[in-house]
Amino acid sequence: MESKKRLDLISLTSIPLVMTLGNSMLIPVLPSIQKKLEISSFQVSMIITVYSIVAILLIPIAGYLSDRIGRKKVIIPSLIITGIGGLVTGWAAWKINDPYWIILLGRLLQGIGSAGAAPVVLPLVGDMFKNEKEVSSGLGLIETSNTFGKVISPIVGAVLASVIWHLPFWFIPLFCFISIVLVFFLVKVPKADDKKPPLFHDFVKSFKKTFKYNNRWLIAIFSIGGIIMFVLFGILFYLSTTLEEMFGITGIQKGLVLAIPLLALSIASYIAGKKIGQNKAVMKWLTFSGSLLLSISLLSAIFTDEIYFLLGILFISGIGIGTTLPCLDALITEGIEKEARGTITSLYSSMRFVGVALGPPIYAIIMKSDHNMVFYISAAASFIASTFAFFAIKPEKEKGENIKEENLMKKSPYRLSDY
């Protein structure tokens, strides 16, 4: 990796870290918020879900704008909006007697900001490096930052909430400010090509053409990303409630317990990002193996009520998720031409947010009937993801030189180099 771009990349890692902290550090605090506001488990799950729903709708627009006007011009205003959303939620929780709906409004603003920040990082990393191995390594670092945020977020959230329950809301604008400074001063955007970005009509036409020729692997990757995040956030929501209700684990101790499977996720993500290089066959099989490992480990959880055995199972599940995510990032980023990279990767990010949005409320409903059903559904969803990876992602073996780009361009303005 070019040494002069290390600072750029390190600065970019602050964005997924901030966005993850802004969402995931609330998970261990949700039971406390539920008690303070006197709301149902479904209502408290909406604090996570409303953030994700608005992001789902706006991420593709942010991706298109980043292709048109530039990545940095989308990222910085988005971070500012996220910070404002954090101020709204903090102020509502502090000053208003019945703050639930204003908190949701603040979370809505955070979702708007997140739509234009974290998802645009992926195509920007793709723009910064010409060598696919460096792109994979950079994406692995971004995904590791994302997962590292998930590891520390329950601990940070629990520590802050132990002081006062709404303190986590106030730290979101602080984190955003730090990220804005880093991105503004340290990230150097690659010089734009001379050719003009496509008009919206041409963009829609080429977008349709892309899915005509690449629908199988694109839909597979979108689906796997959504399923993985659905299971991850659903299980985290389940754990946050169960640790408190069934095992009496609360506060900072609960944050530490929640961090255990997320630590496995972070380590696996870092190693996978470093090892996959530009070998798309390896990416396919790691995606398949990680999803299958997740399915098997979660299914085995129905056979125990012991907390230590359960955490061991979830540690293995974290390895499965951490192995899968960097491969999905690399497949979709390296397989798309620069001009459309922002839009397509943003659609992928939208699908991941669909999983984040659906996980907590659906698991909140399932938990009322049968706790084992949580693991049955999680295992089944993960198995479906593994079948998508097995049957729909089919990298061809390279024979001599790579297929020439101009031949691929006859089919589509987007590519998956070895497909």
Model-flagged regions — what are they?
Residues 1-2, 188-220, 410-414, 419:
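Juxtamembrane intracellular "pre-TM" segments in multi-pass secondary transporters
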Residues 59-71, 268-281:
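Helix-to-loop junctions at the C-terminal end of transmembrane segments
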Residues 80-97, 292-305:
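C-terminal ends and interior cores of transmembrane alpha-helices
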Residues 100, 104-148:
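Cytoplasmic helix-loop-helix junction between adjacent transmembrane helices
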Residues 141-186:
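Helix-loop-helix hairpin linking two adjacent transmembrane segments in secondary transporters
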Residues 173-193, 386-393:
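C-terminal membrane-cytosol helix-exit motif in multi-pass small-molecule transporters
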Residues 216-258:
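Extracytoplasmic gate region of multi-pass secondary transporters
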Residues 281-328:
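C-terminal transmembrane helical hairpin of 12-TM major facilitator-type secondary transporters
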